[in-house]
């Protein structure tokens, strides 16, 4: 919680400046800064990441961006400086198909594509993501809004794990990033590694990450949350949801809507998708799914 002290101090100084200002423009600017930092302080005190209204595609509404310009500008300058002088590379490969990074910029897209990354998990709340860039470059993008130095709620963390598993299962390289690549992104990556390695301890998962990214370091709040989630068995993934689709029936709606369906279901289920062909019927695929332990099967098409 130490970071909130700086926001509170900044808000107080801004309102003091407003109180003693005789210039209307300085007064307006001081009020703007004071209001922005006050709202940010409240967000941190009460753990309200939604205050930034960041959407799952990483975008923040225009009016929110203007309200928080003093904070967002300061945050961007700090992130840029910290990244430039960081001891480790901005993007690092932790596991096959799994990368860890600090704040990403559009200039990072070619590097990600060269590394085989086609999906981005953004675990920040306080700044715009690569929403338009990712869409233009056909990258899958998902935002899990978490405030700096905080940990996600259990249900939100589970969404991230399912989303990661669905993309990695389909041979997509995935990068998880926060502001500095040290806390929030490390927590989510450790949670995913624990879901894939049930016999591991929290310490083993963190050691795996820190062996590559030396600056990875959870604070006390984040470490306590990760250990609690692990003890509660949160990372035990449920039985997959199977989808059997006929791509030509229903006027061919499945190919048109497939990407959206996957996007909507990925944060909630492990997806196994099978498609019928001229020589493979839905009945054959259904039996195949049952033989592999399927408990829930959804038929699409027609």
Task: Go through each PLM region and give its residues.
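Buried hydrophobic packing segments
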Residues: 188-193, 286
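Glycine-rich, N-terminal phosphate-binding loop of Rossmann-like dinucleotide-binding domains
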Residues: 123-124, 245, 301
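ATP/NTP phosphate-donor binding region
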Residues: 137, 230-297
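Cys-based phosphatase fold recognition centered on the PTP superfamily
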Residues: 2-132, 211-237
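Phosphate-handling active-site elements
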Residues: 194-209, 294
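Cysteine-based protein phosphatase catalytic domain of the PTP/DSP
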Residues: 81-173, 197, 204, 217-223, ...
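A phosphate-binding catalytic loop at a beta-strand-loop-alpha-helix junction
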Residues: 171-190, 297-302
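Short beta->alpha linker loops
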Residues: 104, 180, 277-281, 301
